[in-house]
């Protein structure tokens, strides 16, 4: 049985940990509201961009000289996987889910005979994958902001990806990130960003922009090819930006939930330790009283 001194020390230690987890929960909660609003506000823009590019792609299908960002390189032998994780832990299964999804995707592609390269945005992704895939990891970026995500960050990362694509270092690029649903729910998402994947609604001829009436006829100025040449690189940056916003909101939600659970568990542990401490102290006092009474009777 632990001594009273040991129990007091453990109670003090758990209380100290509880203060830390409670503070981290409040910090994550304050960041979550803004991160959630930003991620949700970006969704309509990115979705509209996808539909517009899908319509442009459909109207230029079969034309010669299509951009490789749209039509691809003509092969899919080399795949670049961009994994979005956090720089820090203490956020439940947030990082682990991305690491597992990336690991699964790498194995699937390698089983098909593809060459896989990994670019990790966030320290935890690189740390979790480098042991199993040291040769596949070609870079890691761990300097993204822990307070807010700016478009300049996404633009910098997208330029790196585009430079690699133009240099012929890969054929297909897939983004793996957590899409935010709620503070307790995040969905691991795989999104192909190079070459551009036409949305299923556009590919099926069902543009959701208009639910009734005649199908819209678009006229473009300048030409479709010029618009695509300008928008396709921007779309890569926008999709990376959306992934980063969704990932950041998911991280804050996961951390708030994890720290809330940790705070509750610490409270339960303090109650149990306090009960054990009081029982031990009571038993010790009772034992001392018995010894005193026994000594008095002997006299």
From Swiss-Prot:
Membrane topology: Peripheral membrane protein
Listed Gene3D superfamilies: 3.40.1380.10, ATP synthase, gamma subunit, helix hairpin domain
InterPro entries: ATP_synth_F1_ATPase_gsu, ATP_synth_F1_gsu, ATP_synth_F1_gsu_CS
GO MF entries: ATP binding; proton-transporting ATP synthase activity, rotational mechanism
One example of a Gene Ontology biological process annotation: proton motive force-driven plasma membrane ATP synthesis
Coiled-coil positions: none
Protein family membership: Belongs to the ATPase gamma chain family.
Cited function: Produces ATP from ADP in the presence of a proton gradient across the membrane. The gamma chain is believed to be important in regulating ATPase activity and the flow of protons through the CF(0) complex.
NCBIfam families according to UniProt: ATPsyn_F1gamma, PRK05621.1-4
Protein name: ATP synthase gamma chain
UniProt source species: Rhodospirillum rubrum (strain ATCC 11170 / ATH 1.1.1 / DSM 467 / LMG 4362 / NCIMB 8255 / S1)
Lineage: Bacteria, Pseudomonadati, Pseudomonadota, Alphaproteobacteria, Rhodospirillales
């Amino acid at each position: 049985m632990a001594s009273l001194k040991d129990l007091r020390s453990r109670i003090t230690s758990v209380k100290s940990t509880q203060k830390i987890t409670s503070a981290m929960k409040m910090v994550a909660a304050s960041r979550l509201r803004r991160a959630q609003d930003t991620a949700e506000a970006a969704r309509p823009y990115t979705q509209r961009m996808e539909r517009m590019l899908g319509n442009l792609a459909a109207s230029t299908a079969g034309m010669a000289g299509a951009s490789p960002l749209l039509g691809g390189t003509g092969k899919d032998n080399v795949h670049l996987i961009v994994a979005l994780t956090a720089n820090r832990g203490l956020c439940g299964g947030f990082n682990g889910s991305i690491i597992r999804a990336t690991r699964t995707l790498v194995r699937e592609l390698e089983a098909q005979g593809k060459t896989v390269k990994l670019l990790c945005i966030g320290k935890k992704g690189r740390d979790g994958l480098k042991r199993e895939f040291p040769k596949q990891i070609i870079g890691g970026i761990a300097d993204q902001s822990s307070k807010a995500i700016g478009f300049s960050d996404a633009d910098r990362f997208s330029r790196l990806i585009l430079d690699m694509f133009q240099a012929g270092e890969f054929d297909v690029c897939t983004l793996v990130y957590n899409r935010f649903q709620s503070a307790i729910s995040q969905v691991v998402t795989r999104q192909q960003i190079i070459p551009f994947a036409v949305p299923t609604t556009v590919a099926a001829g069902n543009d959701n922009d208009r639910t009734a009436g005649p199908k819209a006829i678009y006229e473009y100025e300048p030409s479709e090819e010029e618009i695509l040449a300008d928008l396709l690189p921007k779309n890569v940056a926008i999709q990376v930006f959306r992934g980063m916003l969704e990932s950041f909101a998911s991280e804050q939600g996961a951390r708030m939930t994890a720290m809330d659970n940790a705070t509750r568990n610490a409270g339960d542990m303090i109650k149990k330790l306090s009960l054990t401490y009081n029982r031990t102290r009571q038993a010790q006092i009772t034992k001392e009283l018995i010894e005193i009474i026994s000594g008095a009777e002997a006299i």
